[in-house]
Structure formats: structure tokens, C-alpha cells
Amino acid sequence: MARRQKTVSKVSLTKNTSKQRKNMGRVRKAIKTKTPTIDDVNILLRLAELYNTTIDFEAAEWFWAKMHKDELPSSIQEFKDKYPQGSREFQLFERFTSKFELAGLLIKYGFLNEDLYFNRFGSLRTEWERSKDVIMGIRKEWDDPHFRENFELLSIRASKWLETHPQTTK
């Protein structure tokens, strides 16, 4: 009889754990889709202010000009040949991608409301796709698998966000 009680206890513990997991999933979803607060707005504005510098404007202009002319290198080797580490262009690439890294980090840990961020900045699909090969090359070359991982996470979350937030204007 004692054995049977132990088994029953294990089963009920497993059921509770399963219920707890389901509840945690609901809580996480509720947190992710919460209505933005004034604190969320302030964090978004602070992030915008942080990247509102001359070098950030230069970095964005450089990235978009190279992208539109199809001059943005698509491999790490081509990137290094054209823009060696320490060059102004390498710094601009670093700065351009760093703002997405920081936003991804803040969203990942729940400090920045993703609805608010993606509603303001969009999907980042182009930014990630055009930067991805260089970033992956840097990860490998520097033996740093975490280099710009939050930018990558941001892009993945943005794609998922777009699926659930269709365009409201035509």
C-alpha cells in the first residue's frame, strides 16, 4: 500500500507541474502582449535618444546607401577586404547593428515592449538579412557565437510579430 501512495504522489506532482507550465506559458504571453505603459514609452524614447547621434545618422546613411546600390558585401571575406577592422566603414557597420542588438536585449528580458518597438520600427527583415552573412562570419572569425545574437532574436521576433499584426492601413 505504501508503494501505491508514492506512485500516486508522483503522478499528482507531475500533473501539478504540467498545470504550472501551462499557467507560466499564459503568464509569459500576457506579459509579452501587455498594453504599453508610460515606462515602456520612456524606454523607447531613451533608446531613440541614445542612438540619435551624428555617427548613428552616418551609420544609417552608409548602410542604406550601400544596400540600395547593392554595394553591401554579402560575405565576411568581401566585407573584410573592403572594410578592414578599424576602418570607418567597419565602425559604421558595428554602430548600425549595435542599436538592434540593444533593442533585442531589452525585449528579450522584458524591459522594452515589443509591440511598441515593432510598431515604431517595423520588421527589421531587410536590416537583418543584409547584415546576417557578415555577422555570422564575425561570429566564426572571432569565435564569439553570441555576437549580435540579440539582433538575430529581434529579427525572429519581428517576423512572428508581423504574422499577428497585419497592416491596418491600405
List each language-model region with its residue ranges:
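Acidic, Ser/Pro/Thr-rich low-complexity regulatory regions
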Residues: 2-170
